[in-house]
Amino acid sequence: MSTTLAAPAKLKSLLLNLHTHCIGLHVNDVTPKVYFKLLIRHLLQISRSNAAHPKLRRRAQILLVSLFLSGVTLFSGVTYSTFKIILKCYKFYKFPWKRRNRRPLIRRTRSQMQLDSGARIMYIPEVELVDRQSPDDNKFMNATDKKKRKRIFIPPKDNDVYEHDKFLFKNVELERAKNSQLFYSKFLNQMNVLSKILIPTVFDKNFLLLTAQIFFLVMRTWLSLFVAKLDGQIVKNIIAGRGRSFLWDLGCWFLIAVPASYTNSAIKLLQRKLSLNFRVNLTRYIHDMYLDKRLTFYKLIFDAKASNSVIKNIDNSITNDVAKFCDATCSVFANIAKPVIDLIFFSVYLRDNLGTVGVAGIFVNYFITGFILRKYTPPLGKLAGERSASDGDYYNYHLNMINNSEEIAFYQGTAVERTKVKELYDVLMEKMLLVDKVKFGYNMLEDYVLKYTWSGLGYVFASIPIVMSTLATGINSEEKNMKEFIVNKRLMLSLADAGSRLMHSIKDISQLTGYTNRIFTLLSVLHRVHSLNFNYGAVPSILSIRTEDASRNSNLLPTTDNSQDAIRGTIQRNFNGIRLENIDVIIPSVRASEGIKLINKLTFQIPLHIDPITSKSNSIQDLSKANDIKLPFLQGSGSSLLILGPNGCGKSSIQRIIAEIWPVYNKNGLLSIPSENNIFFIPQKPYFSRGGTLRDQIIYPMSSDEFFDRGFRDKELVQILVEVKLDYLLKRGVGLTYLDAIADWKDLLSGGEKQRVNFARIMFHKPLYVVLDEATNAISVDMEDYLFNLLKRYRFNFISISQRPTLIKYHEMLLEIGENRDGKWQLQAVGTDEAITSIDNEIEELERKLERVKGWEDERTKLREKLEII
């Protein structure tokens, strides 16, 4: 019993003696309530007093800093935990109790909201609904957890920013030609431009995160310096056998571990958070140009650098390369900032111990080894870029196989695809192995220099002050020498570690250079294509030669703005119809107007009833009465035009010009089109958005949020499906409505059903003008007849592109493109002698083919007999 009572008394006596001998504070009669205030007041008094013993004052300062950091850590943790508890209690009160004994709420479908300023608010689910299996009856039931949604504010797009940044990217290469190569760094100039995207202003959140990271880096360096001193003091007390001092230092060790651990975790968290924020800024910047109304994502294929791996595998560039660039940027910053801060702090402290000569010798060693490593550093940036390009090729080929799996299966192309995939995989493995092989020799040299050479020299520099002091005084104090050696050794190791990480960062910078160049190339191309003066990849040298020849013939000076000379056609928007006048249909290429010409001087217009003309005509009829409200097309006359011709003659190219995704090269060419809301295009290949509902497919390109915001209802879509004979789709699913069903509609629907969905889109959007390209080639004859009559019944103005003469009966005008691919064409009204003659010629051609059927069958029989003999 006495032993049990003696233990607390001994512990109390030990604590009282620690306060008395270590910091000179007597706490015998102090109550716990006033203990903390008394301790802080006493420590502040000692740390400020010049009369106090230096050792006592140093201990007081260490305790104050440790208590402050521990208090900050504890306060932040308690505050965050309290906030979370209050938030949980509020949600528990607001939702479960309020909704008890009520019917379950309808699932929220709205994902974003457009503000008047152009900004958007998006709601992103954080926790997905999962299915849980009941342990009692093996029945699946939906989880009761509701989806947590995070509110994200997306600022409106500022086109002025992109117009300004376009010149920044353009001037980088121009500055390289102006400046001397000695003072020019391609990497630094590219990073300088990209940094304006990553951190737009000093008031940006990323700048605050960067400042916080620098603060914690400095804090970690100071803590490392303090731990080094404390380590030497602990070793000294152990050798001297001072038990009380050892216990006191050990308590300080455990106390300082709290802010040190918090600092290390905070640095990692801030680095990851900063990388994600950089990725958000860069991705939004890319998306604003890539997914713009100027159709940058399509026009990229015509840029001069379209064959570059960055643009050819642009999906890999936007996803993987951006992520790698942001991670590498934050990693390199941390790997450079921390060693630099360490070098400054440790050098200042070591200067007092080693002297100026010792610190100078350390830095001379750093510069020599840095020069050696820099000289033998392999081109890791170039190799990283090549590896990323090979990775993109391999990924895209697999993606192409997924998108065309059915076609490959029909062709039995497994062997060919396997060979190609194996070849791309071997190339990828070769690139990855090449990087590892190149790193092998460099890593061996790096380890020898940084780990062993620097450690050996560290022992030499750490022992210099001890040896010199012993020789000078003739006194050998083992305790003092041991403490100084431990402190100097630990600081030297930390300094060597800082230097080695600084040398390691040379390799990281080399890899970052490759990622930076790829991202900069991507943004440069996007800016060029996004520009209003994009010339579709026309090469200036070809244009200048052509311009000089033309100027020489006309005795004029050549113009210098070649980009403006490439595309010289005129586009008139918000026109009450579709008009093409004297337009040369030319495939976009580096030769611009000197490229492959498909159709010469194409001229037509709907919905005006014009006289039959041919390609020999210079212009269409006078449009001075275009504003007359009595004209048929202003009242929805249902004018129609059929563009007829063989494969490869340029029919679909006409649609591309009307949609403004192909340019008008010739100077006297005029394109007049209605506003975007009054024209609708149906391409050859029906498109279905991935992961969307049936409602999303019908209303495309309108979003579901806009659909409900504008007051539309599902019953209108049901009526449209009835009109296009697709109402049976609604009976496939079970539940409230099949319109909410999510499926891979591209594979679920047949070819004819997908084309009828296109007509459903026309019925929903109700445009004044529709351009259809082979929109019924997968539909039966009776359904085709019904759909075209549906367009005529609702008085749509439409242009059909086809190679089947059977569609002539549904149109008023016929534009026939020659079969000889000489660029000739003929426009005529259906029912005229020319149109009837054209139809008769088609019928005669079909009859001649039918007469040869018997001969073809005989040839097939003979071939089968020969094959049986073989």
UniProtKB/Swiss-Prot annotation:
Residues 210-501 form the ABC transmembrane type-1 domain. Glycans are attached at residues 142, 281, 403. The chain crosses the membrane at residues 60-80, 207-227, 247-267, 330-350, 353-373, 455-475. Keywords: ATP-binding, Glycoprotein, Membrane, Nucleotide-binding, Peroxisome, Transmembrane, Transmembrane helix, Transport. One of its GO terms (molecular function) is ATPase-coupled transmembrane transporter activity. The keyword Transit peptide does not apply. Forms a heterodimer with PXA2. Belongs to the ABC transporter superfamily. ABCD family. Peroxisomal fatty acyl CoA transporter (TC 3.A.1.203) subfamily. This is Peroxisomal long-chain fatty acid import protein 2.
